[in-house]
Amino acid sequence: MNIESEKEQFLKEFGSYYGYANSPKNIDEIRATEFKRLNDTVYLDHAGATLYSESQMEAVFKDLNSTLYGNPHSQSTCSLATEDIVGKARQQVLSFFNASPREYSCIFTSGATAALKLVGETFPWSSNSSFMYSMENHNSVLGIREYALSKGAAAFAVDIEDTHVGESESPQSNLKLTQHHIQRRNEGGVLKEGMTGNTYNLFAFPSECNFSGRKFDPNLIKIIKEGSERILESSQYSRGCWLVLIDAAKGCATNPPNLSMFKADFVVFSFYKLFGYPTGLGALIVRKDAAKLMKKTYFSGGTVTAAIADVDFFKRREGVEEFFEDGTISFLSITAIQHGFKIINMLTTSSIFRHTTSIAAYVRNKLLALKHENGEFVCTLYGLLSSEMGPTVSFNMKRPDGTWYGYREVEKLATLAGIQLRTGCFCNPGACAKYLGLSHLDLLSNIEAGHVCWDDRDILHGKPTGAVRVSFGYMSTFEDAMKFVNFVESNFVISSFNRCALQPRSISLPIEGIAEAAARHFLTSITVYPIKSCAGFSVDQWPLTSTGLLHDREWILKSTTGEILTQKKVPEMCYISTLIDLNLGKLFVESPRCKEKLQIELKSSSLVTERDEMDIQNHRYEVTSYNNEVDIWFSRAIDRPCTLLRNSDSQSHSCINKNGSPGMCRDVGARLNFVNEAQFLLISEESIKDLNSRLKSNGRRRNGGQAVQVGVMRFRPNLVASSGEPYAEDGWSNINIGGKYFMSLGGCNRCQMININPEAGEVQRFTEPLATLAGYRRAKGKIMFGILLRYENNTKTESDTWIRVGEEIIPNGDRH
């Protein structure tokens, strides 16, 4: 695909929408001057967070360095000046939404979520109230349901369908609402009220769905306020006064609600979604009449005009903003928003909307047109039935046989290609279930299988558990979009051109009768990794146990938040070296950041403090912890607080978790220490040589002759085999090493951890060798290199069995 001709075709179709031709700066100038830090990165997660510009941040820092700001609750000169700037910021926000200051107030919060929480906490719920919300809402909106239900109110979701049947003067005839079942709680202490007082109900919907990009008709505000009885068929849930909440967190950057035309009662958003900075700051735009109904209990500094400490008395401030903003607001962040609005106002939101949606339409059309060589379509896009779409495209992809590509595979390969995107359900469970066709039974089944947010279980029971999302911001370009489309086509469309690249090389098993002529294999290296994700040590011989190599991954480091630390997040762990002396019965640990070498007794140690139980990836472990001296040593070694834990269960653990599922583990039923999938990883020297040859060739093409070369230890194998053909190990169903029998569990799925270079003197992250492996070692969503093994111990009790370097490896033999 030629970029010049492709762009020419794009401009013929979208030229009047794309590029800000009538602005002081066009898109190419904006990218060249304001976003140089992107370099070759393609950033496509603007729905998650858009980017700040260089001139914006220069203005922010210049302002902070030249202006004296004080606490706006003080009465000093600088504080009064700060208060004035905060007031101007409120007006700027209201103007952005075309909201009259006579009708609306701007309450600053820590973000859209905090604004939603404030509405839920203070809304005048009663047992006669209803909370109605569209299915396609963010979790932060769904959380309001807890406040409603706890006060005895009813809660229910609705599907909103845009029918567009014929011409109509009224928008009501084009919108159809389908009600889901009513949710209620019968909790003690909930006051059951009659119909004597006013009943207030709340309806919440997003201006744009963050999952699909579907834009919702703002006429919903008037429809609900004036026609709730018709829509809800005069049920008891339609009675009372309806207030409307718009979650504009996703939509505000390109098409903010116009509050002069559509009178919503509450609008929430975050500033980093608008222009990247500041984070931790959002706002609740509230209609003044609605604010009078809000029942706030807590008061704080700045929210009262008077309070008496030893008497039940306080007097609230009259201003809406003053009473609802607890404590000192983030005034330095608030002063920064004026600099963010500059580029938005220069371009105008209408131009930003046209620019971003033209790019999204291009991507949408290209993805829909992709076909495999057998004629099957590649992409399934979500939200296409909507009349209007925002600058977001969410989709999944299928192989020629109709099975799904996992979204984690897409994300992994995109990262290697320099493309930043988002995968999963995007904290929008209703939209996720709706578009993916997941029933309640499907969702519960996935949960039973151990699936949680942010995990790697992207395909369960033959269905995707989430999707791939790309979203565009005001600084996105056609070139970004085309690079992404090319990435999808080259990595996921099966054609005669790229079929070989998308299938792993496999080796046929030796033909009977000529096995004697096959190359002989020998064990050339044994490596033990006592502490998970830290450096290991090589030995000539080592004892085998029912859990694998003796003491292999018997220890782990845990963060103060309970997270198990690995090189994926703490690459500095590769510099922690380990050594076990079996004769001395000690584990020795060293780090360049620690002067003293740490020594830990293997059998009994004064450093041990207590035993405990903990769950890791749904498996229960008995662990031993160590005293503060040990934890301080490791915390210094990785420059973050952590604790050292040892697996103290003599039986170790089975791979089956408490849900009856193996999770990511493949060594089902085996006894394991803190390994991810299996007891052993075996790598072939010939496979490493072949990979390095490919890396050298790719380096010449991509980097002008500079090539990355990797050693076998980059892959953290326990066992290294010599001789034979590259990837011969792929065909081994079992191996015999010096009379010890091992069962193959298949290939090892590689992750970005192999891109960390531990030999450079400092931690360096590359795209290689994983990017090259992805080009020829992909199989069913995984990038395979090396094989996983399980030791088949013939005896029921632990025996004195050793494995030794130099022993012959005999593949695919009979077990004796």
UniProtKB/Swiss-Prot annotation:
Q: Provide a Gene Ontology MF annotation, just one.
A: molybdenum ion binding
UniProt key word Oxidoreductase: no
Q: Which Pfam families match?
A: Aminotran_5, MOSC, MOSC_N
Q: In which pathway does it act?
A: Cofactor biosynthesis; molybdopterin biosynthesis
- What Gene3D superfamilies does the annotation carry? Type I PLP-dependent aspartate aminotransferase-like (Major domain)
Q: Where is the MOSC domain?
A: 647-812
Which UniProt keywords are given for this protein, alphabetically ordered? Molybdenum cofactor biosynthesis, Pyridoxal phosphate, Transferase
For this protein, what is the EC number? 2.8.1.9
Query: What is the documented function of this protein?
Result: Sulfurates the molybdenum cofactor. Sulfation of molybdenum is essential for xanthine dehydrogenase (XDH) and aldehyde oxidase (ADO) enzymes in which molybdenum cofactor is liganded by 1 oxygen and 1 sulfur atom in active form.
Task: Supply the name of the protein.
Answer: Molybdenum cofactor sulfurase
Q: Which gene encodes it?
A: FLACCA
